[in-house]
From Swiss-Prot:
The keyword Transport does not apply. Belongs to the purine/pyrimidine phosphoribosyltransferase family. It is an enzyme of class 2 (transferase). Pathway: Purine metabolism; AMP biosynthesis via salvage pathway; AMP from adenine: step 1/1. CDD domains: PRTases_typeI. It catalyses: AMP + diphosphate = 5-phospho-alpha-D-ribose 1-diphosphate + adenine. Its EC number is 2.4.2.7. Pfam families: Pribosyltran. This is Adenine phosphoribosyltransferase. One of its GO terms (biological process) is purine ribonucleoside salvage. One of its GO terms (cellular component) is cytoplasm. One of its GO terms (molecular function) is adenine binding. PANTHER family: ADENINE PHOSPHORIBOSYLTRANSFERASE.
Amino acid sequence: MDLKGLIRDIPNFPKPGIVFRDITTLLSDAEGLRYTIDTLTEKCKAANLSPDYIVGMESRGFLFGVPLAYQLNAGFVPVRKPGKLPAAVHQVEYELEYGTDSLEIHQDALNNHHNVLIVDDLMATGGTAKATADLLEKIGCNVLGFAFIIELKALEGRKKLPNLPIISLVDY
Protein backbone atom coordinates (compact mmCIF):
# COMPACT_ATOMS: atom_id res chain seq x y z
CA MET A 1 0.00 0.00 0.00
CA ASP A 2 1.19 3.52 -0.80
CA LEU A 3 1.12 5.17 2.63
CA LYS A 4 2.88 8.24 1.31
CA GLY A 5 -0.10 8.77 -0.99
CA LEU A 6 -2.36 8.89 2.08
CA ILE A 7 -0.30 11.61 3.80
CA ARG A 8 -1.22 15.14 2.75
CA ASP A 9 1.51 17.74 2.22
CA ILE A 10 0.69 21.22 3.51
CA PRO A 11 3.24 23.73 2.17
CA ASN A 12 4.31 26.68 4.32
CA PHE A 13 2.82 25.32 7.54
CA PRO A 14 3.38 26.07 10.37
CA LYS A 15 5.71 28.68 8.84
CA PRO A 16 7.06 29.60 5.40
CA GLY A 17 9.45 27.06 3.91
CA ILE A 18 8.13 24.10 5.92
CA VAL A 19 6.14 21.26 4.34
CA PHE A 20 3.86 19.80 7.01
CA ARG A 21 3.17 16.07 6.67
CA ASP A 22 -0.51 15.81 7.63
CA ILE A 23 -1.48 12.33 8.86
CA THR A 24 -5.17 13.14 9.31
CA THR A 25 -5.82 11.85 5.80
CA LEU A 26 -4.10 8.57 6.69
CA LEU A 27 -6.08 8.31 9.93
CA SER A 28 -9.38 8.82 8.09
CA ASP A 29 -8.65 6.03 5.59
CA ALA A 30 -9.77 2.78 7.28
CA GLU A 31 -7.69 0.52 5.04
CA GLY A 32 -4.62 2.75 5.36
CA LEU A 33 -4.93 2.95 9.13
CA ARG A 34 -5.31 -0.82 9.46
CA TYR A 35 -2.34 -1.36 7.14
CA THR A 36 -0.24 1.09 9.19
CA ILE A 37 -0.93 -0.64 12.51
CA ASP A 38 -0.57 -4.12 11.01
CA THR A 39 2.75 -3.19 9.39
CA LEU A 40 4.12 -1.64 12.58
CA THR A 41 3.10 -4.81 14.43
CA GLU A 42 4.78 -7.07 11.86
CA LYS A 43 7.99 -5.00 11.89
CA CYS A 44 8.14 -5.05 15.70
CA LYS A 45 7.70 -8.81 15.75
CA ALA A 46 10.27 -9.29 12.97
CA ALA A 47 12.76 -7.23 15.00
CA ASN A 48 12.00 -9.36 18.09
CA LEU A 49 10.74 -6.32 19.98
CA SER A 50 8.56 -7.52 22.86
CA PRO A 51 7.76 -4.47 24.96
CA ASP A 52 5.95 -4.53 28.27
CA TYR A 53 4.73 -1.04 27.40
CA ILE A 54 4.38 1.23 24.40
CA VAL A 55 5.30 4.78 25.34
CA GLY A 56 3.49 7.27 23.12
CA MET A 57 4.94 10.72 22.59
CA GLU A 58 2.55 13.66 22.77
CA SER A 59 0.27 13.76 21.02
CA ARG A 60 0.14 11.91 17.72
CA GLY A 61 2.17 9.09 19.21
CA PHE A 62 -0.96 8.27 21.19
CA LEU A 63 -2.92 7.67 17.98
CA PHE A 64 -0.59 4.91 16.81
CA GLY A 65 0.73 3.76 20.17
CA VAL A 66 -2.54 2.54 21.66
CA PRO A 67 -3.52 0.21 18.80
CA LEU A 68 0.08 -1.03 18.54
CA ALA A 69 0.08 -1.77 22.28
CA TYR A 70 -3.14 -3.75 21.82
CA GLN A 71 -1.62 -5.74 18.94
CA LEU A 72 1.56 -6.48 20.91
CA ASN A 73 -0.30 -7.32 24.13
CA ALA A 74 1.46 -4.45 25.90
CA GLY A 75 0.31 -1.60 28.08
CA PHE A 76 0.34 2.02 26.94
CA VAL A 77 1.88 4.98 28.78
CA PRO A 78 1.79 8.59 27.53
CA VAL A 79 4.70 11.03 27.73
CA ARG A 80 3.31 14.54 27.84
CA LYS A 81 4.28 18.18 27.85
CA PRO A 82 4.45 19.87 31.27
CA GLY A 83 1.24 20.38 33.20
CA LYS A 84 -0.86 17.81 31.32
CA LEU A 85 -0.60 14.90 33.77
CA PRO A 86 -2.57 15.10 37.04
CA ALA A 87 -0.40 13.00 39.39
CA ALA A 88 3.25 13.24 40.47
CA VAL A 89 5.64 13.12 37.51
CA HIS A 90 9.21 12.47 36.46
CA GLN A 91 10.47 15.22 34.15
CA VAL A 92 13.30 15.71 31.68
CA GLU A 93 14.39 18.99 30.13
CA TYR A 94 15.95 19.02 26.68
CA GLU A 95 17.46 21.49 24.25
CA LEU A 96 15.64 22.88 21.25
CA GLU A 97 17.21 24.93 18.48
CA TYR A 98 16.26 28.15 20.31
CA GLY A 99 15.62 27.27 23.95
CA THR A 100 14.50 24.33 26.03
CA ASP A 101 11.41 22.20 26.52
CA SER A 102 10.49 19.39 28.86
CA LEU A 103 8.53 16.15 28.96
CA GLU A 104 6.77 14.36 31.80
CA ILE A 105 5.59 10.88 32.71
CA HIS A 106 3.62 9.77 35.76
CA GLN A 107 5.94 8.52 38.51
CA ASP A 108 3.81 5.41 39.03
CA ALA A 109 3.45 4.55 35.32
CA LEU A 110 6.59 2.43 34.90
CA ASN A 111 9.00 0.62 37.17
CA ASN A 112 12.64 -0.38 36.90
CA HIS A 113 13.46 -2.85 34.17
CA HIS A 114 10.27 -2.49 32.13
CA ASN A 115 10.92 -3.02 28.43
CA VAL A 116 9.49 -0.12 26.44
CA LEU A 117 9.07 0.84 22.79
CA ILE A 118 8.74 4.56 22.02
CA VAL A 119 6.17 5.47 19.34
CA ASP A 120 5.43 8.72 17.51
CA ASP A 121 4.03 9.74 14.16
CA LEU A 122 7.17 11.46 12.88
CA MET A 123 10.90 11.64 13.49
CA ALA A 124 12.58 14.84 12.40
CA THR A 125 15.77 15.83 14.26
CA GLY A 126 15.34 13.07 16.85
CA GLY A 127 15.52 15.53 19.76
CA THR A 128 12.16 14.71 21.32
CA ALA A 129 12.65 10.98 20.82
CA LYS A 130 16.08 11.20 22.47
CA ALA A 131 14.65 13.19 25.39
CA THR A 132 11.90 10.58 25.82
CA ALA A 133 14.48 7.78 25.83
CA ASP A 134 16.61 9.70 28.34
CA LEU A 135 13.59 10.16 30.63
CA LEU A 136 12.72 6.47 30.47
CA GLU A 137 16.31 5.35 31.07
CA LYS A 138 16.55 7.78 34.01
CA ILE A 139 13.70 5.92 35.73
CA GLY A 140 15.26 2.54 34.99
CA CYS A 141 13.40 1.38 31.87
CA ASN A 142 15.02 -0.62 29.10
CA VAL A 143 14.33 1.22 25.83
CA LEU A 144 14.00 -1.43 23.11
CA GLY A 145 13.72 0.98 20.21
CA PHE A 146 11.51 3.43 18.34
CA ALA A 147 8.65 3.20 15.86
CA PHE A 148 7.60 6.09 13.63
CA ILE A 149 5.17 6.38 10.76
CA ILE A 150 7.22 9.08 9.01
CA GLU A 151 10.95 9.77 9.02
CA LEU A 152 12.40 12.98 7.61
CA LYS A 153 15.74 11.49 6.51
CA ALA A 154 17.42 14.79 5.62
CA LEU A 155 17.22 15.91 9.27
CA GLU A 156 19.31 12.89 10.35
CA GLY A 157 17.36 12.09 13.51
CA ARG A 158 18.88 8.60 13.63
CA LYS A 159 22.22 10.12 14.61
CA LYS A 160 20.71 11.08 17.99
CA LEU A 161 19.38 7.55 18.54
CA PRO A 162 22.39 5.29 18.01
CA ASN A 163 22.45 1.58 18.73
CA LEU A 164 18.67 1.19 19.00
CA PRO A 165 16.30 -0.30 16.42
CA ILE A 166 14.29 2.33 14.56
CA ILE A 167 11.22 1.36 12.56
CA SER A 168 9.77 3.88 10.12
CA LEU A 169 7.20 3.24 7.42
CA VAL A 170 7.49 6.30 5.16
CA ASP A 171 10.63 8.27 4.35
CA TYR A 172 10.80 11.83 3.07
